[in-house]
UniProtKB/Swiss-Prot annotation:
Record text on subunit structure and interactions: Part of the 30S ribosomal subunit. Contacts proteins S5 and S12.
UniProt KW keywords: Ribonucleoprotein, Ribosomal protein, RNA-binding, rRNA-binding
Gene Ontology cellular-component terms listed: ribonucleoprotein complex; ribosome
Alphabetical GO biological process terms: translation
Protein family according to the UniProt entry: Belongs to the universal ribosomal protein uS8 family.
Disulfide cysteine pairs (residue numbers): none
Full protein name: Small ribosomal subunit protein uS8
InterPro entries: Ribosomal_uS8, Ribosomal_uS8_CS, Ribosomal_uS8_sf
Known function: One of the primary rRNA binding proteins, it binds directly to 16S rRNA central domain where it helps coordinate assembly of the platform of the 30S subunit.
Organism whose genome encodes this protein: Micrococcus luteus (strain ATCC 4698 / DSM 20030 / JCM 1464 / CCM 169 / CCUG 5858 / IAM 1056 / NBRC 3333 / NCIMB 9278 / NCTC 2665 / VKM Ac-2230) (Micrococcus lysodeikticus)
Single GO molecular function: rRNA binding
Amino acid sequence: MTMTDPVADMLTRLRNANSAYHDTVSMPSSKLKTRVAEILKAEGYIQDWREEEAEVGKKLTIDLKFGPQRERAIAGLRRISKPGLRVYAKSTNLPHVLGGLGIAILSTSSGLLTNQQAAKKGVGGEVLAYVW
């Protein structure tokens, strides 16, 4: 069965594993999900990610990050642009998440970028998700 919104599925799996204090979470892999995982690692929200061979296709495994007393590195995730309602932002009107404490992940003509990277490059795009 095909998945309607793979990014929402990824964010939901991350949110559920994070709230249950799981150390890792696995999901079907794609280029888009891999790029989202790269951004989350670069911004310090996850410890690491890897792509593994599965019975069918590839599997993306993400190692979640916790503090010394098991504090969650990811406080929240929200899918913004959905298949039924796409949300776009111009380069002059990029979103700020929690006053700059969180990140927005955008799909731009330059690939997937955070709101800060998109502002530096002067590009806008589709707002995929907020992470804080």
